[in-house]
């Protein structure tokens, strides 16, 4: 991710020449009948192994594409997924299929950070009516220039959209999923929720880190370009709100052929296999690659990406070929159920 700067983006000039006093922001309007949740209270899939995958990037996939890729995930014993949807019709098409497959989904409405969305409540209700757990990611990589028109990010615009979305998802009984790749933008968002008296949200909020490893080994911790980089965000939550919410890594892992850091070898077929087997084994052994215990807050890791013709991160269908030996090695890991400290 780009290094965030402290230079604010100038607002679009208006025709009002006289400056006005900044109004006191209104407090968030949150229902008061939802219980706070501890880590043990959060829904998880039956036979949970912490293994996941980001689903296809087309937010309007065909039924054939949906079914083919769910089957691939089932063949690899995946229990979690991040799934994009374009509209409520797609949600109604996708949700029952994942429900019936036993895969727990983090739903992500296809939105840019500058786009307000007014149907969070409807979408949460669709999921509830279908018997689907309403894990809902709100926006995606808002600090990244490519998400904005002409690459000009505007944090103030995004934060207003975030507050409105957080309020709507929370009040509908959904689980509020925050996603940031910028540490500063996360801190600013948490502070704004506190300023708006929205702390109740923190007790029903989860975080979706993006933990890409470049060509760094699984144990790498020198900087944020690591599959272990979710630990950096855990420290921020601990400092800012006093605890660490559930985390489901929603993108990340290794790109086949990656050579970003000259100190480390290219991610060839063998390393791709070895790195992913090690990553997914965290949930089996209870130990991270750096020797730390697997934290209870890390619910799942969903690497980028199950399938895409134009993306050499993809496990299937890529121009770079299918990641056959990685897929077979993952399938060969003995079946297990992930254990938490409270069990």
Predicted regions and their residues:
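Catalytic domains of carbohydrate-active enzymes, especially glycoside hydrolases
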Residues: 61-89, 133
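Aromatic-lined carbohydrate-recognition surfaces of secreted/lumenal glycan-active proteins
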Residues: 170-188, 241-255, 291-306
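Substrate-binding cleft of extracellular glycoside hydrolase catalytic domains
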Residues: 86, 93-185
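Aromatic- and acid-rich polysaccharide-binding/catalytic face
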Residues: 107, 190-230, 243-258, 303-308
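Aromatic-rich peripheral "rim/lid" segments of glycoside hydrolase catalytic domains that contact
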Residues: 31-45, 52-63, 261-271, 275, ...
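Hydrophobic faces of well-ordered beta-strands that scaffold small-molecule active sites
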Residues: 51-53, 81-83, 105-108, 134-138, ...
């Amino acid at each position: 991710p780009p290094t965030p700067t402290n230079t604010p983006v100038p607002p679009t000039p208006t025709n009002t020449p006289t400056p006005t006093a900044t109004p006191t922001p209104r407090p968030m309007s949150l229902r008061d009948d939802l219980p706070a949740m501890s880590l043990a209270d959060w829904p998880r899939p039956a036979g949970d192994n912490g293994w996941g995958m980001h689903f296809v990037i087309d937010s309007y996939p065909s039924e054939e594409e949906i079914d083919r890729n769910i089957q691939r995930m089932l063949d690899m014993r995946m229990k979690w997924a991040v799934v994009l949807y374009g509209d409520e019709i797609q949600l109604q098409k996708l949700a029952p299929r994942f429900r019936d497959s036993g895969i727990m989904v983090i739903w992500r409405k296809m939105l840019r950070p500058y786009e307000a969305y007014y149907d969070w409540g409807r979408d949460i209700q669709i999921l509830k009516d279908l018997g689907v757990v309403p894990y809902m990611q709100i926006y995606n990589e808002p600090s990244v220039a490519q998400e904005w028109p002409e690459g000009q990010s505007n944090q103030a615009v995004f934060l207003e959209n975030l507050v409105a979305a957080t309020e709507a998802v929370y009040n509908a009984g959904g689980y509020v999923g925050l996603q940031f790749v910028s540490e500063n933008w996360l801190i600013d968002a948490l502070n704004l929720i506190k300023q708006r008296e929205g702390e109740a949200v923190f007790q029903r909020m989860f975080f979706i880190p993006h933990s890409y490893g470049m060509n760094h080994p699984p144990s790498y911790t020198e900087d944020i370009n690591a599959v272990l980089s979710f630990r950096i965000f855990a420290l921020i939550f601990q400092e800012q709100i006093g605890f660490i919410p559930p985390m489901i890594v929603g993108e990340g892992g290794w790109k086949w052929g990656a050579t970003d850091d000259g100190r480390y070898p290219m991610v060839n077929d063998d390393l791709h296999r070895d790195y992913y087997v090690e990553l997914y084994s965290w949930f089996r052994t209870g130990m991270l690659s750096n020797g730390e215990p697997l934290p209870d807050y890390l619910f799942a890791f969903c690497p980028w990406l199950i399938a895409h013709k134009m993306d050499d991160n993809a496990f299937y269908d890529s121009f770079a070929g299918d990641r056959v030996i990685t897929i077979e090695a993952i399938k060969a890991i003995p079946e297990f159920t992930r254990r938490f400290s409270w069990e």
